[in-house]
Design a protein with these regions (language model features):
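Substrate-binding/active-site groove segments that recognize
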Residues: 36, 43, 181-205, 222-224
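Acidic helix/loop microenvironments that form the catalytic cleft of cell-wall polysaccharide enzymes
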Residues: 53-74, 168-172, 218-225, 236-239
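Proteolytic processing junctions in secreted/extracellular precursors
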Residues: 6-21, 133
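Conserved alpha-helical segments that form or flank metal/cofactor-binding pockets of metalloenzymes
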Residues: 171-179, 198
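A short, structured beta-strand-centered segment in the mid-to-C-terminal lobe
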Residues: 204-217
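Export/targeting segments at the very N-terminus of extracytoplasmic proteins
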Residues: 25, 29-51, 127-174, 216, ...
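Extracytoplasmic/secreted envelope proteins and their assembly/folding machinery
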Residues: 61, 144, 148, 161-165, ...
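Catalytic and substrate-binding regions of cell-wall glycan-acting enzymes that process beta-1,4-linked
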Residues: 58-130, 238-239
Length: 239
């Protein structure tokens, strides 16, 4: 389900490029935010303050959508320290609706990699809470009972239930078997690459060629893959 558009994107000029020292602070700051989010502890005071588009729950979702390598590239590009190749720009574009004020910024080849990355991240940052609010208002309704039971059944959760509910809503509209791209399955829309990675890293839990459609199994796989991609993403930021 497409996120809704919200505030208008305001480009950042190239003179605001971040140096390596500030980038290291941003990475450290982001990692501290992730730890506080998972543990539900107060965030430490940020010096310098990380821009909203580089922190927040949407940044836990981007590695799932773009892959850890892609998410790290986007993070670095938004910090002025990496370039986005045409293939990456195209992938960003297909994940932003054409009606969004961000769409043309990402589409425009004259825009810098930094401007494109910031536009993409601002779109998700500024709309995530709207998506979350809608997801949480729906999950308690009888027609979404299967999705709620599945998310509640996740073993050893390391991500908050509200975040997982929002991701499931973003991926499948809380439908355990949406009729969309046949390569992606279930509540969390697990694809072939994600399934292969789950089997490689967690062979004790994931086996076989078929991605599970069972809501509980799919929700567990969705949770585990979100955790895996975020762990790898944070390592990629250091490389």
């Amino acid at each position: 389900m497409a996120l809704k558009k919200f505030h208008e994107f305001q480009p950042v000029c190239e003179s605001q490029e971040l140096n390596e020292g500030i980038f290291r602070n941003l990475i450290s700051d982001f990692k501290n935010w992730v730890i506080s989010f998972w543990k539900k502890t107060p965030e430490a005071k940020k010096v310098p303050k990380t821009p909203d588009y580089l922190s927040g729950e949407h940044m836990l979702y981007i590695p799932h959508q773009q892959g850890p390598d892609g998410a790290a590239k986007i993070f670095k590009a938004a910090s002025g320290l990496a370039k986005l190749d045409p293939a990456t720009r195209k992938k960003l574009l297909v994940n932003v609706p054409t009606g969004s004020v961000y769409y043309n910024t990402i589409k425009d080849p004259k825009q810098t990699s930094k401007q494109v990355a910031i536009a993409f991240l601002k779109y998700y940052s500024e709309n995530w809470n709207l998506l979350k609010k809608e997801a949480l208002s729906l999950i308690t309704k009888p027609e979404y009972k299967k999705a709620k039971i599945a998310i509640d059944s996740i073993q050893n959760p390391q991500l908050p239930k509200e975040f997982l509910t929002t991701v499931a809503f973003k991926e499948s509209s809380l439908n355990p078997n949406p009729k969309r791209n046949p390569n992606y399955k279930g509540l969390f829309q697990i694809g072939p690459l994600a399934w292969a990675e789950l089997k490689r890293l967690m062979p004790f839990r994931y086996k076989g060629n078929k991605i599970p459609l069972d809501p509980k199994k799919n929700a567990q796989a969705g949770h585990d893959y979100l955790k895996i991609t975020n762990d790898v993403f944070q390592k990629k930021l250091q490389s």
